[in-house]
Amino acid sequence: MRTSTTVGHVMTREVITATPATSFKDLVGMIVTDRVSAVPVVSPEGSLLGVVTEADLLCRQAHQDDALGAGCPHFAGHLTREDWRKAAAQTATTLMSAALHTTTPGATLPEVARLLTTNGVRRLFVLDGEHLVGVVARRDLLRTFLRTDEDLRADVDRTVFEDALHADKNNVLATVEHGVVLLTGRLEYEADVATAERLALAVPGVVGVRNRMDFVWQGQGPQHVAG
C-alpha cells in the first residue's frame, strides 16, 4: 500500500447531504439512521451552503419549556434571537450554520490534524473549488495508525532508504513493532542519519522511531536530502 499523505486518500466520499428545503424531521432521521453528527447542506449545483449539527436540532428540545411559558430555570431570560430562530426552525435553511471548517483533497494529514485540534471540531468538509467532494473526520486520521507493521516497514524502506537516501539495502534495516520503527545499519553521512529518522516519523501510521543507525563520514553529503 502506498503512503496516504493527503485528505483525498482518507476522506469519506459518499456524504449524506441535505438541501435547504429538507425538513427538520428528515434531518433528524439522517443523523439518527446514518449515525452522523452533522449533515452538510448543499445547493442543487453541489456547492456547500452550511451544516446542520446535532446541537442545532437539539435547540428545539432545549428551549421547549420556554416556548410553552413554563419558565425553565436553565434558559428563561437567556434566549438569544439565534436560539429562538433555531428552536422554531422547520427546514435546513433556517437551522444550518454558515460558519464552516473546510479543507481540500490535497491537504496533508498533519495539516488537517492541526485544523481539527485547533478549532475543536470533529470533522472538516472537503471542497474542490466550491463543491463538496467529501468529509474527513478525526477517526479517518486515526485509522492510519491501524496500518500493519509489515505495511509500515515496506513504506519506510521505500520512502526513506530507496527514494530519499538511495541507501545500499544491504547496509540498512527497518523493523516495526506496534507501529514503532527501529532503524539500524550504517549510512554514508552523519546528516543522513537524522534525515532517516525525520522521514520515517513522517510516514502515516508510524507511532514513533528509535534510531540506532551509524555513519561513515561526519557532516552532510553531496546528495543529502534538504528540508
Language model feature labels by segment:
Residues 1-37, 42-47, 51-227:
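N-terminal targeting leaders
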